[in-house]
Protein backbone atom coordinates (compact mmCIF):
# COMPACT_ATOMS: atom_id res chain seq x y z
CA UNK A 1 0.00 0.00 0.00
CA UNK A 2 1.37 3.41 -0.99
CA UNK A 3 0.23 7.00 -1.21
CA UNK A 4 -1.28 8.79 -4.19
CA UNK A 5 -2.17 12.41 -4.91
CA UNK A 6 -4.83 14.10 -7.00
CA UNK A 7 -4.98 17.82 -7.74
CA UNK A 8 -8.39 19.30 -8.47
CA UNK A 9 -10.42 22.42 -7.72
CA UNK A 10 -10.73 21.38 -4.07
CA UNK A 11 -6.95 21.30 -3.76
CA UNK A 12 -4.31 18.58 -3.53
CA UNK A 13 -5.80 15.44 -1.99
CA UNK A 14 -3.60 12.68 -0.57
CA UNK A 15 -4.96 9.14 -0.57
CA UNK A 16 -3.73 5.56 -0.64
CA UNK A 17 -3.38 2.79 -3.21
CA UNK A 18 -4.89 -0.56 -2.23
CA UNK A 19 -6.41 -3.53 -4.06
CA UNK A 20 -5.88 -2.00 -7.50
CA UNK A 21 -7.77 1.16 -6.52
CA UNK A 22 -7.00 4.70 -5.43
CA UNK A 23 -8.75 5.35 -2.12
CA UNK A 24 -9.47 8.73 -0.57
CA UNK A 25 -11.12 7.87 2.73
CA UNK A 26 -11.84 11.28 4.26
CA UNK A 27 -12.24 14.33 2.05
CA UNK A 28 -13.77 17.26 3.96
CA UNK A 29 -16.25 19.25 1.89
CA UNK A 30 -18.02 21.37 4.51
CA UNK A 31 -16.77 24.08 6.84
CA UNK A 32 -16.91 23.21 10.53
CA UNK A 33 -20.22 24.35 11.98
CA UNK A 34 -22.57 23.88 14.90
CA UNK A 35 -24.82 20.80 14.61
CA UNK A 36 -27.99 22.74 13.76
CA UNK A 37 -26.42 25.30 11.41
CA UNK A 38 -26.91 25.18 7.67
CA UNK A 39 -23.92 23.73 5.80
CA UNK A 40 -21.31 25.92 4.12
CA UNK A 41 -19.00 24.58 1.41
CA UNK A 42 -15.33 24.28 2.34
CA UNK A 43 -13.08 26.75 0.56
CA UNK A 44 -11.05 25.38 -2.36
CA UNK A 45 -7.33 25.05 -3.01
CA UNK A 46 -6.38 23.24 0.21
CA UNK A 47 -3.96 20.42 0.97
CA UNK A 48 -6.19 17.60 2.22
CA UNK A 49 -5.07 14.38 3.89
CA UNK A 50 -7.68 11.76 2.99
CA UNK A 51 -5.76 8.69 4.17
CA UNK A 52 -7.77 8.04 7.36
CA UNK A 53 -11.55 7.45 7.40
CA UNK A 54 -13.70 10.11 9.07
CA UNK A 55 -17.51 9.92 9.52
CA UNK A 56 -18.17 13.52 8.44
CA UNK A 57 -16.13 13.51 5.23
CA UNK A 58 -16.90 12.04 1.83
CA UNK A 59 -14.82 9.18 0.47
CA UNK A 60 -13.84 8.36 -3.12
CA UNK A 61 -12.70 5.07 -4.62
CA UNK A 62 -11.41 5.09 -8.20
CA UNK A 63 -9.81 2.45 -10.43
CA UNK A 64 -6.02 2.65 -10.26
CA UNK A 65 -5.82 3.29 -14.00
CA UNK A 66 -8.49 6.03 -14.02
CA UNK A 67 -7.27 9.49 -14.99
CA UNK A 68 -8.93 12.72 -16.17
CA UNK A 69 -10.73 11.84 -19.39
CA UNK A 70 -11.30 8.17 -18.51
CA UNK A 71 -14.94 9.12 -17.84
CA UNK A 72 -15.90 6.27 -15.52
CA UNK A 73 -19.55 6.23 -14.40
CA UNK A 74 -19.89 7.79 -10.95
CA UNK A 75 -22.02 6.15 -8.26
CA UNK A 76 -22.83 8.28 -5.21
CA UNK A 77 -23.73 6.16 -2.22
CA UNK A 78 -25.86 7.64 0.54
CA UNK A 79 -26.06 4.15 2.06
CA UNK A 80 -23.08 1.82 2.55
CA UNK A 81 -21.33 1.21 -0.81
CA UNK A 82 -21.63 -2.15 -2.55
CA UNK A 83 -19.28 -3.84 -5.02
CA UNK A 84 -20.40 -3.18 -8.61
CA UNK A 85 -17.43 -4.57 -10.52
CA UNK A 86 -14.71 -2.76 -12.42
CA UNK A 87 -14.87 0.63 -14.06
CA UNK A 88 -16.80 2.78 -11.57
CA UNK A 89 -15.82 5.73 -9.44
CA UNK A 90 -17.57 5.39 -6.08
CA UNK A 91 -18.33 8.29 -3.75
CA UNK A 92 -19.76 7.74 -0.28
CA UNK A 93 -21.50 10.86 1.03
CA UNK A 94 -22.39 11.35 4.71
CA UNK A 95 -25.12 13.67 5.89
CA UNK A 96 -26.67 14.75 9.16
CA UNK A 97 -29.64 12.71 10.28
CA UNK A 98 -31.97 12.83 13.27
CA UNK A 99 -32.83 16.15 14.85
CA UNK A 100 -29.61 17.75 13.57
CA UNK A 101 -30.48 16.93 9.98
CA UNK A 102 -34.25 17.17 9.81
CA UNK A 103 -35.79 19.15 12.66
CA UNK A 104 -37.20 22.21 10.85
CA UNK A 105 -37.01 25.77 12.13
CA UNK A 106 -39.58 28.48 11.55
CA UNK A 107 -37.18 30.53 9.42
CA UNK A 108 -36.32 27.63 7.09
CA UNK A 109 -37.52 27.78 3.50
CA UNK A 110 -40.24 25.32 2.56
CA UNK A 111 -38.68 21.97 1.72
CA UNK A 112 -35.29 22.88 3.24
CA UNK A 113 -33.60 20.31 5.47
CA UNK A 114 -30.00 20.42 6.65
CA UNK A 115 -29.45 16.71 5.98
CA UNK A 116 -30.49 17.17 2.36
CA UNK A 117 -28.43 20.35 2.05
CA UNK A 118 -25.33 18.42 3.17
CA UNK A 119 -25.78 16.02 0.25
CA UNK A 120 -26.58 18.86 -2.15
CA UNK A 121 -23.21 20.48 -1.41
CA UNK A 122 -21.47 17.12 -1.80
CA UNK A 123 -23.03 16.73 -5.25
CA UNK A 124 -21.76 20.18 -6.21
CA UNK A 125 -18.30 19.13 -4.97
CA UNK A 126 -18.52 16.06 -7.19
CA UNK A 127 -19.42 18.16 -10.22
CA UNK A 128 -16.36 20.36 -9.69
CA UNK A 129 -13.83 17.68 -8.78
CA UNK A 130 -14.72 14.15 -9.83
CA UNK A 131 -13.20 14.40 -13.30
CA UNK A 132 -9.75 14.58 -11.67
CA UNK A 133 -10.42 11.11 -10.21
CA UNK A 134 -11.33 9.71 -13.64
CA UNK A 135 -15.09 10.09 -13.19
CA UNK A 136 -17.64 11.50 -15.62
CA UNK A 137 -19.52 14.42 -13.99
CA UNK A 138 -22.29 14.05 -16.58
CA UNK A 139 -22.91 10.39 -15.65
CA UNK A 140 -23.72 10.39 -11.93
CA UNK A 141 -26.12 7.98 -10.20
CA UNK A 142 -27.29 8.50 -6.61
CA UNK A 143 -28.10 5.37 -4.59
CA UNK A 144 -29.82 5.13 -1.21
CA UNK A 145 -31.89 2.73 0.89
CA UNK A 146 -34.49 3.43 3.55
CA UNK A 147 -34.00 6.90 5.05
CA UNK A 148 -31.21 7.62 2.54
CA UNK A 149 -33.54 6.71 -0.33
CA UNK A 150 -35.94 9.35 0.96
CA UNK A 151 -33.12 11.92 0.81
CA UNK A 152 -32.26 10.83 -2.74
CA UNK A 153 -35.86 11.28 -3.86
CA UNK A 154 -36.07 14.67 -2.15
CA UNK A 155 -33.10 15.79 -4.23
CA UNK A 156 -35.17 14.96 -7.33
CA UNK A 157 -37.83 17.53 -6.49
CA UNK A 158 -38.16 20.36 -8.98
CA UNK A 159 -37.20 22.89 -6.28
CA UNK A 160 -33.96 20.98 -5.55
CA UNK A 161 -32.83 19.31 -8.77
CA UNK A 162 -30.16 21.23 -10.68
CA UNK A 163 -28.68 18.54 -12.90
CA UNK A 164 -25.92 17.38 -10.51
CA UNK A 165 -26.89 13.75 -11.19
CA UNK A 166 -28.67 11.80 -13.90
CA UNK A 167 -30.25 8.86 -12.09
CA UNK A 168 -31.49 7.73 -8.67
CA UNK A 169 -31.87 4.20 -7.33
CA UNK A 170 -34.13 4.42 -4.26
CA UNK A 171 -34.52 1.17 -2.32
CA UNK A 172 -37.53 1.01 0.00
CA UNK A 173 -37.63 4.75 0.75
CA UNK A 174 -38.69 5.51 4.30
CA UNK A 175 -40.36 8.87 4.90
CA UNK A 176 -41.71 10.14 8.25
CA UNK A 177 -44.97 8.53 9.25
CA UNK A 178 -46.70 11.78 10.22
CA UNK A 179 -46.21 15.53 9.69
CA UNK A 180 -43.66 17.14 11.98
CA UNK A 181 -46.27 19.50 13.43
CA UNK A 182 -48.05 16.48 14.93
CA UNK A 183 -44.83 15.33 16.62
CA UNK A 184 -43.41 18.72 17.63
CA UNK A 185 -44.74 18.44 21.18
CA UNK A 186 -42.89 15.19 21.85
CA UNK A 187 -39.66 16.60 20.38
CA UNK A 188 -39.90 19.58 22.72
CA UNK A 189 -40.62 17.26 25.65
CA UNK A 190 -37.67 14.96 24.88
CA UNK A 191 -35.17 17.76 24.38
CA UNK A 192 -36.53 19.92 27.23
CA UNK A 193 -35.43 23.00 25.32
CA UNK A 194 -36.92 25.65 23.03
CA UNK A 195 -36.87 24.42 19.44
CA UNK A 196 -34.74 27.22 18.05
CA UNK A 197 -31.42 26.96 16.25
CA UNK A 198 -29.54 28.94 18.92
CA UNK A 199 -30.95 26.97 21.86
CA UNK A 200 -30.38 23.58 20.26
CA UNK A 201 -26.82 24.46 19.28
CA UNK A 202 -26.28 25.52 22.89
CA UNK A 203 -27.76 22.23 24.12
CA UNK A 204 -25.58 20.21 21.75
CA UNK A 205 -22.48 22.00 23.02
CA UNK A 206 -23.25 21.86 26.74
CA UNK A 207 -24.96 18.46 26.90
CA UNK A 208 -23.81 16.64 23.75
CA UNK A 209 -25.34 13.29 24.68
CA UNK A 210 -28.88 14.54 25.19
CA UNK A 211 -29.67 15.29 21.54
CA UNK A 212 -28.67 11.80 20.41
CA UNK A 213 -30.43 10.03 23.28
CA UNK A 214 -33.58 12.04 22.73
CA UNK A 215 -33.63 11.23 19.04
CA UNK A 216 -33.16 7.51 19.65
CA UNK A 217 -36.16 7.56 21.98
CA UNK A 218 -38.16 9.49 19.41
CA UNK A 219 -37.26 7.13 16.54
CA UNK A 220 -38.06 4.05 18.62
CA UNK A 221 -41.72 5.06 18.85
CA UNK A 222 -42.30 7.30 15.83
CA UNK A 223 -39.75 6.20 13.24
CA UNK A 224 -36.99 8.27 11.66
CA UNK A 225 -37.17 11.97 10.93
CA UNK A 226 -36.56 12.94 7.34
CA UNK A 227 -37.68 15.21 4.53
CA UNK A 228 -41.44 15.55 4.16
CA UNK A 229 -44.08 15.58 2.82
CA UNK A 230 -43.21 13.40 -0.18
CA UNK A 231 -45.24 13.94 -3.35
CA UNK A 232 -44.11 12.02 -6.44
CA UNK A 233 -45.76 14.61 -8.70
CA UNK A 234 -43.11 17.14 -7.56
CA UNK A 235 -40.18 15.16 -8.99
CA UNK A 236 -38.23 16.73 -11.85
CA UNK A 237 -38.82 15.02 -15.19
CA UNK A 238 -35.10 15.17 -16.09
CA UNK A 239 -34.10 12.79 -13.30
CA UNK A 240 -34.37 9.05 -14.06
CA UNK A 241 -35.72 7.39 -10.92
CA UNK A 242 -36.04 3.72 -10.01
CA UNK A 243 -37.80 2.83 -6.78
CA UNK A 244 -37.03 -0.78 -5.86
CA UNK A 245 -37.35 -3.08 -2.87
CA UNK A 246 -33.62 -3.53 -2.32
CA UNK A 247 -30.10 -2.59 -3.36
CA UNK A 248 -29.26 -5.05 -6.16
CA UNK A 249 -25.57 -4.53 -7.06
CA UNK A 250 -25.84 -6.19 -10.47
CA UNK A 251 -28.90 -4.21 -11.46
CA UNK A 252 -27.43 -0.98 -10.09
CA UNK A 253 -24.24 -1.52 -12.13
CA UNK A 254 -26.27 -1.93 -15.32
CA UNK A 255 -28.47 1.05 -14.43
CA UNK A 256 -25.49 3.32 -13.70
CA UNK A 257 -23.37 2.67 -16.81
Regions found by a protein language model. Name each.
Residues 110-132:
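Alpha/beta-hydrolase active-site loop
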Residues 44-64, 97, 111, 117-120, ...:
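Mature extracellular catalytic domain of secreted serine hydrolases
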Residues 1-111, 223, 245-256:
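Non-catalytic accessory segments of hydrolases
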